[in-house]
């Protein structure tokens, strides 16, 4: 079976919890940049939780059981969808912090959203195509041929 090192994700989970607790103690959470930061923290919490659960299930002795594989796939989606949102969230946060968000044209916003929309389309069609990842009776997790697209879209 595949062995995953999940120390980073476990630390990220606890760090996200601590930061969320600290964040909810703030008085000015209603500001736009704080709301985006809150979304980023929740995104990270979902991502780290799903990645730890997915890795634990893949390493499980019952990983090839069809039910376990289905739940593992669900956790993979719960990891990948928020993971692909990180560049959009970070970019939005930066644009708001520097005051650029008020000057953004609709064309820019469409161009900004296209990479995320493409990746989201691949993820939503993945159960039928296996383009991003898949599992089989012999392997609980296999990267698909378009997995590098997720990394490419993150850099656009």
Where would I find each of the regions flagged by the language model?
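Extracellular-loop-to-transmembrane junctions of the mid-late helices
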Residues: 2-13, 119-156
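Hydrophobic alpha-helical transmembrane segments of multi-pass membrane proteins
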Residues: 7-28, 32-92, 109-129
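Class A GPCR helix-loop hinge within the 7TM core
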Residues: 88-105
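Helix N-cap and loop-to-helix transition residues
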Residues: 30-31, 105, 144
């Amino acid at each position: 079976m595949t062995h995953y090192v999940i120390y980073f994700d476990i630390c990220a989970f606890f760090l996200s919890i601590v930061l969320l607790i600290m964040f909810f103690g703030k008085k000015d959470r209603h500001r736009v940049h704080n709301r985006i930061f809150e979304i980023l923290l929740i995104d990270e919490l979902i991502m780290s939780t799903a990645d730890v659960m997915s890795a634990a299930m893949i390493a499980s002795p019952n990983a090839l059981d069809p039910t376990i594989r289905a739940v593992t796939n669900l956790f993979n989606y719960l990891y990948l969808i928020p993971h692909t949102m990180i560049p959009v969230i970070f970019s939005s946060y930066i644009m708001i912090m520097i005051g650029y968000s008020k000057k953004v044209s609709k064309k820019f916003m469409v161009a900004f959203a296209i990479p995320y929309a493409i990746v989201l389309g691949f993820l939503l069609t993945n159960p039928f195509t296996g383009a991003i990842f898949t599992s089989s009776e012999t392997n609980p997790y296999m990267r698909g041929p378009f997995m590098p697209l997720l990394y490419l879209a993150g850099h656009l």
